[in-house]
Amino acid sequence: MDNSSQSKPSSSSSSHSPSPAAITPTQRTTRDSGLCSTIDIPEIQAQCIDNLNSHYLGKGTYGLVEKTRYRKTRQDDFRPAAIKYSSQLHMATLIREAKVMWDLRNHPNIIKIYGLYKSPRNGQGVVMEYMDCGSMADLLYDRTHINYTIDHVASWMFQLSSAVDFFHSNSQVHRDLKLQNMLLSDRYRTMKLCDFGTFTSMHQSMTSNRGTPITMAPEVFRCEQYNMKSDIYSIGIIMWQIIARNHPYRRDLSVPGLLYNVATANLRPQELECNPILSEFYKKCWNDNADIRPTSSECVEYFTLLKDEYPNGSVPLSDSSTNGPAETPPPHAHRPTMLGTSSGSGIGSNNRTPTASKLLNPQQPGQGHRRNRSETFVVQPDLPYPTVPGEAGASRIPKSQSEAKNFRDRAKSEQRQPHRDARPPPPFEHRRDSNDEEKHAVFMNICSNEETRPIDPDTRDEKSLEIFHQHCDNNKQYADAWVIKKEVMRAKHELIAQWPQHDHTVELLERKYYLEQEIARYRDIQDDNYFSTERM
């Protein structure tokens, strides 16, 4: 209420106390503040979905994903689409993600949502556009026969930074940027962001562990106050992954060991032999000091210049196995990993051998614009673990480096090894992939809880580091025990459900035994009668 609207009391009423001004209640903002309501998202009718041609694509973080055909009205033709369903437990998360995507639907590098659809078979779902080339992780690590150049890197990174800058300009942050959330289409030339389940507004106090460990900013793991610069850190890691076409960290490194060393020992991906124009930028993006990282608009400006220098990002990718253009892959189910919810690379997810990239190296300043020979980005040999650049870094935390290595070795030794002998596998061994993902989720929830998360250690104090390691180990053991208990209870309920069938089987066996005895007794009587007749 404006002050001008409150008239002062007249002199005739000066003996009376003026009425107090109305107090405006403080509105409590939540991470859903500013999002559209569900009624703003159109409800898709059953006749607009071709259920007969729908088939399973894969399993996401909160439910399954199907490929289907969708049309806006009965007069329109069907076109490919994807439907993301959710279990009842995570329905609120799915609806919230739909609201976010609906608000961002006008950006060309963000997945478009068509509406909400209630399936008689799978329940509530969100219908969105279908990206026919899979994720960036699929391209980098699975389809190594498909080649790309620095032109495509510049184009993809420009599209990514453009989408990030779009919601950063509205004071919103994604918090889970990764290769698996970058979907490709149009012969791998168009990139769009998906999975906005962790999306939130900057008006909220953000200190919780949200995101994927490989691209999680160190301040997020330290449970410090963080901001939009956490997305910039993820951009730096993604840029390194696409340039190197490699995994940023050792595949045998445990999740707690990775997060601890990134947050306290400044662990980063290996050095690449590439143009300093590229390496200096992604190193600036993943700087431990968030204030040094560039803004999203500066990222757009940088990748715009890089794209102008290498403008052939619109050229279709080539397939080295056929010496022709890369074909659109058939739809397939995404692989589960222990670190994320979808396909792609993850620490300990599988045993794929990292493949070196075959990108064309940007020429040094002063050379001609177009390249006349092919060069490759070369990954240097494994660096000491963890990498601390310069003498200053070596003198800063010599003990924490050794302690971090011991922590990694101890965590690694606790991991279950695959069975190589002929003995039968232990119970629930066939569910290891899903268990690892669930254990990681439980572990991250424990570490984000103010009552159970480890207190940040003093890297100069050996006792403080030891206590931190023990706390992390206890949290990991608790997560393992919680998941095992859940599996045991599930097996118990399955046995209870099968008990009536077991009773029926026992009853049938008893009847069978009784009949066998009766038949044997009848045969004995017949034999006795036969011998009696012969003697007579």
From Swiss-Prot:
Residues that, per the record, bind ATP: 57-65, 84
PANTHER family membership: MITOGEN-ACTIVATED PROTEIN KINASE KINASE KINASE 7
Example of a GO cellular component annotation carried by this entry: striated muscle dense body
UniProt entry tagged with the keyword Amino-acid biosynthesis: no
Gene that specifies this protein: mom-4
Record's subunit section: Interacts with, and is activated by, tap-1.
UniProt name for this protein: Mitogen-activated protein kinase kinase kinase mom-4
Modifications the protein undergoes after translation, according to the UniProt entry: May be autophosphorylated.
Extent of Low complexity compositional bias: 1-20
Phenotype of gene-disrupted mutants: Embryonic lethal with severely defective embryonic morphogenesis with no endoderm and excess mesoderm.
Compositionally skewed regions (Basic and acidic residues) per UniProt: 405-438
Family annotation (SUPFAM superfamilies): Protein kinase-like (PK-like)
Function, in words: Part of the Wnt signaling pathway essential for the specification of the mesodermal cell fate in early embryos. Stimulates the wrm-1/lit-1-dependent phosphorylation of pop-1 and plays a role in the initial nuclear accumulation of wrm-1.
